[in-house]
Amino acid sequence: MSRWLSLLLFAVQAVGGYEAGEELSCKRRHGGIPLPLGVFTVQKEGFPDALPAIRTALSHVHSRSCILQGYRLEMIVKDTHCKTSQGMKALFDLIASRPRPVAILGGQCTEVNEPIAMALKYWQIVQLSYAETHAKFASSDSHELFTTFFRVVPGSRNTNMAKCKFVNHFGWKRVGTVKQNDQPRYALPHEALTTRLEHGFGVKIVHTAGVNWEQIETVGGELDELKERDVRIILVDVDEEMAATVLCAGYHRGMYGDNYVWILPGYHSDKWLNQTHDNCTVEEMREAAKNHFSVEFALTRRDVDTKIVGNTRAGDVWNEITQLDPNNTWRGYLYDGLWTLAIALSHSMGDNAEFSHHKMMEAIDNSSFQGLTGKVKFANNERLGLVDIKQWSDGQYVPFAVYDGADDEFKIIDSTTKGWSPPLDSTITERRREHISSILFLAMSLLALIGIFLALIFLLINFRYRNHRFIKMSSPNLNNIIIAGSICTFASVIMLGLDTRIVSPDVFVWLCYTKTWTLCIGFTLSFGAMFSKTWRVHSIFTNIRMDRKAIKDSKLFIILGILLFIDICVLVTWAFVSPFSYTVTELPHIPEDNIVIIPEVEKCNSSHSGVFQAVLYAVKGVLMILGCFLAWETRHVNVPALNDSKYIGTSVYCCVVMSVLGLSTSVILQERVNEMFSLASFFVIFSTTLTLCLVFVPKVIELARNPVGNEPRAYRRGLMKSVVAKTSQPMSPQPRSDSSGDLIGKAESENKLRRRYLHQKSTQLWDLVEKLRAQGDTRFLQQEWCLSSASPSSQERETSLLLRQPSSSNNREETSLTAAGPNGERSSDWPWVDPDEPSTKL
């Protein structure tokens, strides 16, 4: 009994491992009862030799531990040739042998392991593979199909978890995947990977690209889909040759570099990267593969100084088996696999030394010791081991991170993170609200306020000196309208720059109405008043008739009222039919590396705004065209007091040009808020200020020069010059064949007609003067031009009557146009005191 207790104690010690400096508590004896152990290998070219590592492990089990005291493991090696038939024959040979093997270590090929594992469950014989990584042995029904099958090498469960931890470590939440449909070795673990990413880590699988060799031409299209969906992190589960094809296709689509991360399976080789592809050179392949990651099971543990099972440094054991077979990828798992079986065998021995397969499977599942490939631990027949994550850098793989499945720990190797920074999992969409620059808004608002202040000064002057002769003759009421309209347009500049940084969205909607109405009505008031004044000047100097009536300000206000009525009708209809609403409009995206900026602008939205804007533009356009026409027609008029000289015409031209430019820039630059606001504000402020200055600065100068307004001769001189300039425009050019006599005759005829017209007007003037004198109106008679004048002579009255009667002698109008006295001299009271100083009271 004590013998078996000692054996159990040794087994427990082996399972728990040995600490540094600990010596064996038993004395090993050579020989013992043989325990047959089946070993499946592949002994042919291209496959590594498994026996050196197994023999080393077997030697350490018997010489460096107290387990299996009194027993000796004997290997029964069978070559399966990596063929199903040979493998099954080897299995039957082992089953037929006596005694039967207590367990089987191996094999390496899936096509051999699968039927053997399915058969061994009927004999309850444990099979521990050192090289099987196929995902079918970790599926949901694998425990039922392969009850006694274990593998000491980490499978897809570990590599998938390592990939998930890797993705989660960098905070990537959007990934794309590529799987090889025609290879279950890669397709099955890929499905488990995507499920775990989505449900275990909250990572969105944007798109899974399926590739296979039968439809190899579709690889490019699948990658195009990934690129179109802005996938930056790509997990790939394909074989080596397909991996080269995928990377080559990605290279031609620009899916490489610092903005992309390719996570590939680990093949424990880099030869596939140094081969020339059909569509890529070696240099292109290296460029495409730069900084990609590989995820593969670790060949050995990194902490080489750790004492492992057998009370030996891990580094020493690794060097020992590497010297024996340096090209065997599985040498570490061969070593740990034999130790796993030895420890499980020692634990499965009962008190009566009877072997139990059930206890052995239970012992393997409960194993936990420090091995050459890390901590050896199993869960559901699966090894929970180490997984290396390596990065391709400078033509070689360098360690980047490690995942320990036994302790579920993920660790980045700090020294390898230099020179690389994790990219974003997608292009970041940054919504940037485009607001008018605060400095620009303040500057334009200040200019607008200065303009309003200037307009108020002009309004004060216009009101203060409204009875001044110069101000009174320039229609001060209309000038006040021009000032009111200018104040509205200046105010619209300030309202144009307000946004939701200052006001709420609800107030912004009302602001949409306010600035539209203010600008529209302000333009109509200012331009309409100037248009009315220009029309009156045009009517006076281009429509000289005998029965012409005076055009009073009331008629001009009627014109202005009609224009305002049209605006109000359109604006009110607009407000009811298509009201404004607050909207945020996206502008064209601006890509910047991993960031896409989406500019947004705040707008006053109206479903039918285009229609109403077109109506307003049409009305204003017609008004401006007519204004330009009238300004051109009155270009020769130069009466400062009556039509503000040529300044009104200049203002009309300025308003037209600035309005066209402002409208054009507002439409073209409506997506560039700063440029649009600055130009629109400039045009409004410039044109409005220029109009105010052209209309009122000459008045201010005249007030400074003549505060009393007692120089009527200067006012009358301008009017007479304008009349003469208009009525004495040269006749149309005549052919050079006309004789001098004909030209003189035509000139005399025209002179007679004009002199008759002047005489008639003079007679009418004096008739009115006599009526005023008869009524006792002395204020009018005290005017300077009237004090020294006398009533026209009786001869002149008779002459005037004769001028109204046509001559019948030769059926044509003959007129005696003489204003001379009996002695042939001009009467002193004809029709002005000074013929060179005409009156403005036409």
UniProtKB/Swiss-Prot annotation:
Residues covered by region (Disordered): 725-744, 791-842
Feature: compositional bias, Polar residues: 725-740
Gene3D superfamilies cross-referenced by the UniProt entry: 3.40.50.2300
One Pfam family hit: ANF_receptor
UniProt-annotated glycosylation sites, renumbered to this chain: 274, 279, 327, 366, 605
GO cellular component: G protein-coupled GABA receptor complex; G protein-coupled receptor heterodimeric complex
Protein topology in the membrane: Multi-pass membrane protein
One term of GO molecular function: G protein-coupled GABA receptor activity
Cytoplasmic-side positions: 460-477, 528-556, 632-647, 698-842
Stretches of the chain found on the membrane's Extracellular side: 18-438, 499-506, 578-610, 669-676
Gene disruption: observed consequences: Increased sensitivity to the acetylcholine esterase inhibitor Aldicarb, which results in accelerated paralysis likely due to enhanced acetylcholine release by ventral cord neurons and enhanced depolarization of muscles on one side of the body. Increased locomotion and body curvature (deeper bends) in response to induced GABA release of GABAergic motor neurons, which in wild-type animals results in acute body relaxation.
Transmembrane segments: 439-459, 478-498, 507-527, 557-577, 611-631, 648-668, 677-697
Listed name of the protein: Gamma-aminobutyric acid type B receptor subunit 2
Chain's gene name: gbb-2
